Amino acid sequence: MKRAIALTCGITAAVSFSTTTLFAQTSTNVVDSKSDWSVFVENEPRRCWIVSKPTKTVNMRGGKPVVVNRSDIRFFVTYLPANGVRGEVSFTGGYPFKPDTPVTLTIGSTTHNMYPDGEYAWPESAAVDTQIRSSLKRGASAVVKAQSARGTQTTDTFSLVGFTAALAEAEKRCK
């Protein structure tokens, strides 16, 4: 959402994004649940999103598993109709990503790069969002690999059970 909002609304959008991100992490307005995905809706401005947490997480440093502190790890698809945001994909790894190091998203045999900013990462364009959503609808799981600013390699696996139904519900609620 940051990418789309920043392009359409400048600085005001950055504030709006921060607010939407905060709502995405703290909202209790769950309107539906589709297996491993939850659907949220907020008003003023109207925004809808689906979110899932990982089913498996692996943290490695120096080739060895390590225990690390991470905040919420979530995969999102967001709709913000007032800003023209229609199905923007994003990921938060629960830590600051290593700057200028792409985050990889693999669904089946398809891999996409996502670009980090702080604790969040997004695809490079709305066209890539569309490709990713299409892959997510066909897939069984999504694997996100990233590197923290401290050098920890993380691998987070998300189930895609319920993704298509949750996405359809969010689209319907945020036309």
Where is each model-derived feature located?
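A generic "folded-domain core" signal
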Residues: 23-175
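Bacterial N-terminal signal peptides
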Residues: 8-19
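Positively charged n-region of N-terminal signal peptides that target proteins for export
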Residues: 1-4
